[in-house]
């Protein structure tokens, strides 16, 4: 269940806040561990774009979910656009636009 998975994820990655761990489980389910990988700190996840969105998560979305634009990720897939200001949304889009699309492994 979501609560148990959230608790386990937070235990495995103690730098995650309860909100962040829950968001990752709701967004990725058991694949959240793959998204976070070997991270020991939040800094290991790369740039923080706001609302707990990190470079590693965006990289995952580009390579595994074929995200091609910030709006696709922020509004259609996550609704996290509601939690970011305009500058943060533009930064997410610019980061995604720099990444060439890649097939899933």
Feature map (PLM): residue ranges:
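C-terminal accessory subdomains/tails of enzymes that are appended
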Residues: 1-105
């Amino acid at each position: 269940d979501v609560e148990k998975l959230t608790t386990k994820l937070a235990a495995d990655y103690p730098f995650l806040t309860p909100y962040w761990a829950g968001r990752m489980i709701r967004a990725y389910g058991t694949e959240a561990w793959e998204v976070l990988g070997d991270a020991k700190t939040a800094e290991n996840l790369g740039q923080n774009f706001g609302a707990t969105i990190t470079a590693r998560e965006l990289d995952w979305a580009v390579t595994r979910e074929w995200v091609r634009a910030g709006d696709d990720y922020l509004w259609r897939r996550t609704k996290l656009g509601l939690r970011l200001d305009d500058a943060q949304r533009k930064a997410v889009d610019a980061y995604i636009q720099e990444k060439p699309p890649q097939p899933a492994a």
